[in-house]
Amino acid sequence: MTTLTMEQRRADFEAMLQRANGMRAAGQKRREMYPEADGLMLARLTEEVSDLCHGWHEAAHRASTGVLAPYTVGQVKKHALQVAAHCLAALRDRDPDGYLESAQREGHLSLRSRDLGMPPSVRIGRLITYLGDLAACFTDSYDPDGEIAPHRFRALTIEAICVALAAERGLWQEEEA
């Protein structure tokens, strides 16, 4: 079982969120020069989540067999931060002033055990579920006022940040009690 306090976990969450926001800021100029259509944005995010899920599965398997390389860990963290950065960019487009604070606040409220170890199938299932929730509200008929999508982007952001934290801590499986 982890010896991290909730205060340490929150500080780690904030630091990782800042790293993702740095990635978002680095890509901001390109996004302004080449805006994406909504369908392309969702397709790109789907590909990023897919890469993250595949990477997590591979890393968890390699960790269980004792052949996990630092490169693989770095790739999983990179994929997780890309997903979070993509979601933060979408949130910033909707709320340029408060996007980061709202993600941070919701992250603190919903950390629970999401940044710790869990079975790979659960971790991957959660990522796919949050992506599916986001995709479902991406049409005007489901969310005509655009009020649901920000919550879905924040949920996927938080999950991706928690995946990056778990990868950084080497928590590929459910922790032993």
How would you name each of these model-derived features?
Residues M1-A177:
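Flexible "arm" and connector segments at domain edges
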